[in-house]
Amino acid sequence: MAKFFALKNFTALSDLHPNMANLKIIGIVIGKTDVKGFPDRKNIGSERYTFSFTIRDSPCHFVNVSSWGSEDYIRSLSESFRVAECVIIENPLIQRKDTEREEKFSPATPSNYKLLLSENHSMVKVCSPYEVDTKLLSLIHLPVKESRDYYSLADIVANGHSLDGRIINVLAAVRSVGEPKYFTTSDRRKGQRCEVKLFDETEPSFTMTCWDNESILLAQSWMARETVIFASDVRINFNKFQNCMAATVISKTIITVNPDTPEANILLNYIRENKETNVADEIDSYLKESVNLNTIVDVYTVEQLKVKALKSEGKADPFYGILYAYISTLNIDDETTKVVRNRCSSCGYIVNEASNTCTICNQDSSRLKSFFLSFDVLVDLTDHTGTLHSCSLSGSIAEETLGCTINEFLTMTSEQKTKLKWQLLLERSKIYLKLILSHRARGGLKVTILSCKLADPTEASRNLARQGHT
């Protein structure tokens, strides 16, 4: 089909200046914010509404566009197009931008100007991709920052608190996209959030959180272990609840999906090469918590953990701690206790043994996913103050603790499994834990082991002495 809209028929963003009139601009939408309402100072008791978006018409030129007006007009305009669609803007007002003030909350652009849309005079039309020059459509895969200007996920984790509050760029692949969660704040404002798990060659899992509808909508289109993103200007913070670094999509952020850059292509090849073959990486990514153990410093006794859990009643957030204790129950040689299970390679959940399908991914049995074997062991942890029952020890952490792989374990005789059990039982260990309140768990506390290694006797004695016991 012929291209109806050639770039030469429109004013280029590079040619903008304040005295221009009767403009017609075409561009691809590369970023967009949610609609917001503000008290109208001219009409007390009423509100004005606004949203903004960013358009691009060439590799080097993109501008921010804002619109103010009535709620009906703004919501209708916002809902008429999405990120990655091409739009024609007629009769916008050109204004010189206050770079320092405006780019604090808006995407940084190379232009000295911004566009304002008037409810009475401006118009926005959405173009069909079949009507647009392919050069324009290809811009959606070009990051707005230099392709090598980004942090690897391992660099973010390694830098830790030194990056807290910083705004940086990230190139990563999508590990998983969570379901949007909706909530109401204490002042009755409705909100939403969506957690995206990212990974790259250096880090198996890293959290990026979306708080606005536009980025959540965009994220819902991403394919796990197939989509690569270049996220420009995300905020990095230390997540005190998960004890790790995490990224947040903010109003400055522009996300380029499947960027056409050498660096992104290398990452994409890494995903494809490891998608089916590297089972160990799959196990790590699903079952090994992406928590920097160096950030967990609080030492507890079992009794103290139970008291802390009681004080945290009503809170959904996990807490973390170190426990010097013994593994007092470890049923790995009991034929009636299943300690190795199938997990879904797509989502990491335990496979239903009766149907041999994943109940999370496979409502339709014709869409069977591949599975992998994983340790799934429940252990009791005991110190001088009490016992934590049914603590989860799984995946690669279980392999490290037991000192053997899944395949090695499956070839062991019952006698060998019993010998392995007694090598681990009643040995004082340094154990890193994640704890979360759960009415389904035994004792109301779900405990996940993040690391379990033999304790250094001097270190253990010193910490236990502080608690009045050696």
UniProtKB/Swiss-Prot annotation:
BP GO annotations: double-strand break repair via homologous recombination; female meiosis I; fertilization; homologous chromosome pairing at meiosis; male meiosis I; male meiotic nuclear division; resolution of meiotic recombination intermediates
Root EC class: hydrolase
InterPro entries noted in UniProt: MEIOB (IPR052469), NA-bd_OB-fold (IPR012340), OB_MEIOB_N (IPR056880)
A GO CC term assigned to this protein in UniProt: nucleus
Superkingdom of this protein's organism: Eukaryota
Keywords: Chromosome, Cytoplasm, DNA-binding, Exonuclease, Hydrolase, Meiosis, Nuclease, Nucleus
GO function term, MF aspect, one: chromatin binding
Disruption phenotype: Mice develop and grow normally but show infertility in both sexes. Infertility is due to a meiotic arrest at a zygotene/pachytene-like stage. DNA double strand break repair and homologous chromosome synapsis are impaired in meiocytes.
Pfam family membership, one: OB_MEIOB_N
UniProt-listed Enzyme Commission number(s): 3.1.-.-
Documented effect of changing residue 251 to A: Impaired exonuclease activity without affecting much the DNA-binding activity
Major subcellular location class: cytoplasm
CDD domains, per the entry: RPA1_DBD_B
Tissue distribution: Sprecifically expressed in early meiotic germ cells: in adult and fetal tissues, detected in fetal ovary, postnatal testis and liver. In the ovary, expression starts at 12.5 dpc, reaches a maximum at 15.5 dpc and decreases to become undetectable in post natal life. In testis, expression starts at 10 days post partum (dpp), reaches a maximum at 20 dpp and is maintained throughout adult life.
Keyword NAD included in the entry's annotation: no
Localization terms from the record: Cytoplasm; Nucleus; Chromosome
DNA-binding region boundaries: 167-272
Subunit architecture: Component of a multiprotein complex with RPA2 and SPATA22. Interacts with SPATA22. Interacts with the complex BRME1:HSF2BP:BRCA2.
Family recorded in the similarity comment: Belongs to the MEIOB family.
Function, as annotated: Single-stranded DNA-binding protein required for homologous recombination in meiosis I. Required for double strand breaks (DSBs) repair and crossover formation and promotion of faithful and complete synapsis. Not required for the initial loading of recombinases but required to maintain a proper number of RAD51 and DMC1 foci after the zygotene stage. May act by ensuring the stabilization of recombinases, which is required for successful homology search and meiotic recombination. Displays Single-stranded DNA 3'-5' exonuclease activity in vitro.
Protein name as annotated: Meiosis-specific with OB domain-containing protein
Organism listed in the record: Mus musculus
